[in-house]
Regions:
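Conserved AdoMet
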Residues: 33-107
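Short loop/edge segments at beta-strand edges and connector loops
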Residues: 75, 163-164, 238, 262
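Conserved SAM/SAH cofactor-binding pocket of Class I
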Residues: 97-192, 219
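Class I S-adenosylmethionine-dependent transferase superfamily signal
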Residues: 127, 197, 220, 224
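Mobile active-site "lid"/loop adjacent to the S-adenosyl-L-methionine
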Residues: 184-215
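Conserved Class I SAM-dependent methyltransferase catalytic core
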Residues: 210-273
């Protein structure tokens, strides 16, 4: 690995614990991080000679990938809704499916929004970037809130971030929209996840007990009943296995206009509901 064009073959030869297409993507992300080159830049600069520092950086990335560390944590950043976000293992890595949740919310008119379980701040910051609305967000993790605040600065937006536990959140403010992508993967489903997720992403943000999979949805819905403005909306990202149970729970709590939306993979992923 002495010139730029050798990088992708080196990644493919060294990394066998991810699909080929993902490894190629990891290589391009690494090149962009180290050299600032796009894919087209790679063609123009294919004969660029790598320095010893470049080679050491790339070998470190390859070594970390072989340990199943997510590329986003290795590089310390990811992209969401066209914005750059810093991430580490105290924050869940933003997913493409969650971009659909943001885009859906942006179809509505609102003056105030609360994001519950904000993590890296990706939902709150993306919405604040694209609206003039007042945006607030909470997370139980102080480390996540610290990262979210840094991401707000990076993206030049104002969001009211607070460290708070939704189960002990005494907030008198009301909002036009409340949104949450809460923990929704049952502990028994760990075996179905890639090792890089289970070993490195924060379990606090991922998993719920099999005995009470709707614990966060129920609490957030109850909170929304008292803290949504009249005709306000509640948005959830969900585990598709529990879509019917969540709809039933919202119906029992007298939410109206309940809608189930599919994601880009044709899976039940978002539930929108409203109060009268």
């Amino acid at each position: 690995m002495n010139i730029l064009s050798n990088i992708i073959p080196s990644f493919l030869n060294s990394i066998t614990n991810f699909p080929r297409r993902e490894v190629i993507s990891f290589a391009y992300l690494s090149i962009e991080k180290i050299f600032g080159f796009s894919k087209s830049d790679c063609i123009v600069n294919s004969k660029k000679v790598l320095t010893n520092e470049n080679i050491n950086q790339l070998n470190k990335i390859i070594g970390d990938l072989k340990k199943n560390i997510p590329i986003q944590y290795i590089l310390g950043e990811t992209t969401f809704c066209g914005l750059k976000f810093n991430v580490n293992n105290s924050t869940l890595i933003p997913r493409n499916e969650t971009e659909e949740l943001v885009n859906l919310i942006l179809n509505y008119k609102f003056n105030s929004l609360l994001d519950i379980g904000t993590g890296s701040g990706c939902i709150a910051i993306s919405i604040a970037k694209k609206t003039a609305s007042s945006v607030s967000a909470i997370d139980i993790s102080h480390q996540a809130i610290s990262m979210a605040k840094k991401n707000a600065i990076i993206n030049n937006v104002s969001v009211d971030f607070r460290a708070a536990d939704i189960f002990n959140f005494d907030d008198k403010r009301k909002y036009d929209i409340i949104v949450s992508n809460p923990p929704y993967v049952c502990e028994s489903d760990k075996q179905n996840l890639h090792k890089n997720v289970v070993d490195h992403e924060p379990h606090l943000a991922l998993f719920v007990k099999d005995s009470n999979p709707l614990i966060f949805y129920k609490r957030i819905a109850q909170y929304a009943l008292t803290n949504l403005n009249k005709k306000g909306h509640l948005f959830f990202e969900i585990n598709e296995k529990y879509s019917n149970q969540i709809i039933e729970m919202l119906t029992d709590l007298n939410f109206v206009e309940i809608e189930l939306k599919k994601d880009i993979n044709d899976r039940n992923r978002i539930i929108k509901s409203s109060i009268k």
